[in-house]
Amino acid sequence: MKKSVLIIGPNYFNYLQASEYAFSKLGYNVVTDGYDTPIHPYTSFMKLRYKVSRDKDGLYRKSVNSYNTHIINLFNSTKPSIVFIMNGEILNSETLEYMRRDAKVVVWLYDNLEKLPGSKNHIDYVDKLCCFEQRDVDYYREQGKVAYFLPQACDTATYHPLDIEKDIDISFVGQIYYSPKRRDTINAIVDKFPDKRIVVYGMHQPWYKGIWKWINRENKNVYKNCTISANETNRLYNRSKIVLNIHQEAQKDGANPRTFEIIGSGAYQICDANPYIEMLFKDGEIGVYHNKEELFELIKGGLQNDKSECVNRARKSVLADHSFDSRIKQVLELLELES
């Protein structure tokens, strides 16, 4: 009988597809099912309904109950041997317990616990729970519970080198509006390097947060004020001499997906420091800064010098140890199953 897995996770980015591909290469029959946040399904109608609702909690609970019923029905019809859940904040304990009766259930928290209060207690209802930040593993240990450190990863099918001109000096992709740290850092770079071509994708000034601020926002040539797809992101990285990676405020000790995706694309990365980043790249594979002075010096060096040797060493490491293929094999080892 062929091995089978049900993958459940949020629809954003390409993580469901990357996990599906990794399991498929290991000989698994794969069924994937994605959910939306903050309400499922996040259709135009539901988005409007949720926004104007006077009972958002009630509407959310109804959405959660409906999705959990759907998942139980899907589980019954597909009969997987493994249920692999990414984040899973929409799933309730009864659903997890139900699936655990007949399958191995593992959760991979792809965000930190501060962002996933609905997933915090999943550890009590699954076979294994993995965290992408060591401090979340430590939190569970303090509670007398066992969680496992499983960093994020690169989807190598999406992020890979392209033979195109590097016509952009510095680029960044990520949410900006809700991160003062990112805004402050990027604004400082724009001021310091006014003659360089700098391109930033991500919501910088949403129109719904003030139409006049949106119309009159500064540096429109830098801040594109929109999101781009994973494939477009890979192309942008390949066009860039330097790609910035600035972790959000809540990420204190770990690596976000961009860490590995930038490297996978074959671009030179400059990243803010934290203990895990410094441990992972201690031989100069990427530029790591602790303050703006170090950041500016790294940018100057990245623009003036050939960084291909650093890039090649970093990419070799990611392909060997930090792809989705590697992570799924680690999950199977935790479950004591052959990969």
Sequence positions of predicted segments:
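Proline-aspartate-enriched helix->loop->beta-strand connector
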Residues: F75, K79-V83
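Active-site proximal beta-strand in glycosyltransferases
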Residues: Y98-N112
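Conserved acidic donor-binding segment of nucleotide-sugar-dependent glycosyltransferases
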Residues: G284-K292, G301-N305
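A charged, aromatic-enriched C-terminal amphipathic alpha-helix characteristic of glycosyltransferases
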Residues: Q304-L335
